[in-house]
Design a protein with these regions (language model features):
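Short helix-initiation/N-cap motifs at beta->coil->alpha
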Residues: 66, 87-99
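Alpha-to-beta junction loops
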Residues: 57-61, 96, 100-111
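A bilobed periplasmic-binding-protein/Venus flytrap-type ligand-binding module shared by bacterial periplasmic
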Residues: 32-43, 137-150
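A conserved helix-loop-strand patch within extracytoplasmic ligand-binding domains
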Residues: 8-62, 162-166
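A local structural motif
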Residues: 58-61, 79-92
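Ligand-binding "clamshell"
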Residues: 1-24, 103-105, 117-131
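Short Pro/Gly-enriched coil loops immediately N-terminal to beta-strands
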Residues: 26-34, 128-137
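An extracytoplasmic/periplasmic, membrane-proximal ligand-sensing/linker region
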Residues: 79-84, 152-198
Length: 198
């Protein structure tokens, strides 16, 4: 079954009722699997979604780390869900995959939606229009006792709701991973830009 974001409420209820914890401050970004296509290929075929990709998958090559091909919820399940059959597949080293994409060694690649190198890649992120990949939303889980002892904490964390997009997080990761900037500097500047820190 496709992932249903509507079930997140069930999860928060279990945390609240059974574990006495609350989800407070949902940042807005989703660090899940994503599929990217070289921009030139996406433009040539008019690719915007995974369903679009399915129409032409037999003409394209697909790259991923070895473990994605082995996971029960990985390559085979993904292809089955969308009716895809790629011309060939390529096992990639995680550190070299963006270089391989840029060099045209493959057309399509699995990524994490907040990968730092995604910010600089000449690639199009496709929409998971059937909700195959589960969501990995980022937020804070805080013990209810802590929220009772420090009621100001809820107000502070709630200000973070929806403040960081996937693209924003990827850009910040890029600045830390590729440009060598200290994470605290990148975070401070971002929070200042959003008016959350002076």
């Amino acid at each position: 079954d496709p992932y249903d974001e509507g079930r997140f409420g069930e999860l928060t209820d279990v945390y609240k009722n059974d574990l006495h914890m609350s989800w407070v401050g949902m940042y807005g970004f989703n660090d899940t699997f994503g599929i990217v296509v070289r921009r030139e290929v996406a433009d040539r075929y008019g690719l915007r979604s995974y369903s679009d990709l399915a129409r032409v998958s037999s003409q394209l090559s697909f790259g991923a780390e070895y473990d994605f091909f082995e996971r029960a919820d990985g390559y085979r399940a993904f292809c089955d869900a969308y009716g895809m059959s790629f011309a060939n597949t390529i096992d990639l080293d995680i550190g070299l995959k963006y270089q391989a994409l840029a060099e045209g060694q493959m057309d399509v690649m699995v990524v994490f939606t907040t990968d730092g190198q995604l910010s600089a890649a000449d690639a199009t992120i496709l929409t998971d229009d059937r909700g195959f990949f589960p969501s990995y939303l980022c937020g804070n889980v805080v013990r209810d006792q802590v929220l009772e002892e420090h009621p100001e904490l809820r107000a502070v964390l709630t200000k973070l709701n929806g403040t960081i997009t996937d693209g924003d997080m990827a850009q910040m990761n890029y600045e830390v991973e590729s440009e060598g900037r200290p994470p605290e500097d990148v975070a401070r500047e971002y929070l200042q830009e959003k008016g959350l820190l002076s």
